[in-house]
């Protein structure tokens, strides 16, 4: 991991990062053993959980002394930290999503009751973004979240009910044609988000080559590396339809920095974050969202 040593130097941390791998979909004992191992090792300050957030919560949630509000709400643990000998589990994705959306919108611009949002993907990232959108004041006028997995949609429905929010429309998108139809129904100026992982975790896009973005749309792909096909589709229409494109680089940076701040008890003011972003920039993959991309 090339980024962490650079940030550790900037933040004055005498620390290194080490990967602990668990097979996807591993048995419950693997997650419980890993959390116990972390809790019992005084040399480990904490952890950032990537692909196993839901399973750590599901199988090892009872091992934590405290789970924060978002961990309980979103049924996931993305950050493990210690305070005064206690093991804490947090879900940082809703906070990360909020910070990234502030960057995306820029100073003085906000989503409001006239804005419509389509989020393709109801996994951890899509759920976090939905939670943040629902907590915004004002919240968007219409939020549509689509996924092919009915289990994910059912979980998100429960989360929305706990928030007392009935404004989210949950749609089963079995394939690209369903996603295209949801996109076609959006008005001008909508926010369109790819939170499926397609374009990074697996190649391709949730949309077909025939998809048509609404004029003036704000297009946000949470991916920052990979084939980024979703962004390439949007860029082909950007000039004619006045699209504004954003990749997931800042979302990634906010995610890592929030986890590091939690583990080491740091306060990251905006200037400190921008310094971290500056140090990270040379590691960034050119994307179709950048004007200087090839």
Residue ranges and their predicted role:
Residues 110-113, 136-138, 185-187, 207-217, ...:
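Short, conserved loop/helix-junction motifs that constitute active-site signature segments
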Residues 271-294:
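A short, charged, Gly/Pro-tolerant segment at domain boundaries
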């Amino acid at each position: 991991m090339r980024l962490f040593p650079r940030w550790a130097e900037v933040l004055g941390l005498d620390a290194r990062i080490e990967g602990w791998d668990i097979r996807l979909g591993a048995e419950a004992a693997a997650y419980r053993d890993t959390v116990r191992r972390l809790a019992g090792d005084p040399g480990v300050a904490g952890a950032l959980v990537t692909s196993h957030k839901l399973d750590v919560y599901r199988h090892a949630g009872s091992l934590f002394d405290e789970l924060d509000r978002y961990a309980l709400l979103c049924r996931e643990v993305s950050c493990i930290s210690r305070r005064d000998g206690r093991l804490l589990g947090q879900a940082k994705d809703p906070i990360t999503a909020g910070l990234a959306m502030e960057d995306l919108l820029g100073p003085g611009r906000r989503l409001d009751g006239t804005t419509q949002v389509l989020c393709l993907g109801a996994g951890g990232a899509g759920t976090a973004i939905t939670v943040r959108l629902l907590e915004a004041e004002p919240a968007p006028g219409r939020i549509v979240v689509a996924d092919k997995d009915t289990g994910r949609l059912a979980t998100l429905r429960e989360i929305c009910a706990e928030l007392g929010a009935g404004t989210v429309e949950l749609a089963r998108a079995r394939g690209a044609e369903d996603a295209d139809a949801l996109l076609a129904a959006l008005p001008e100026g909508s926010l369109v988000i790819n939170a499926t992982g397609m374009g990074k975790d697996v190649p391709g896009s949730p949309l077909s080559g025939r998809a048509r973005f609404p004029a003036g749309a704000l297009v946000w792909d949470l991916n920052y590396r990979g084939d980024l096909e979703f962004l390439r589709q949007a860029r082909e229409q950007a000039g004619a339809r006045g699209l504004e494109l954003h990749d997931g680089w800042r979302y990634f940076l906010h995610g890592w920095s929030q986890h590091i701040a939690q583990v080491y008890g740091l306060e990251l003011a905006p200037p400190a974050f921008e310094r971290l972003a500056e140090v990270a920039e040379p590691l960034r993959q050119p994307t179709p969202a950048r004007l200087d991309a090839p």
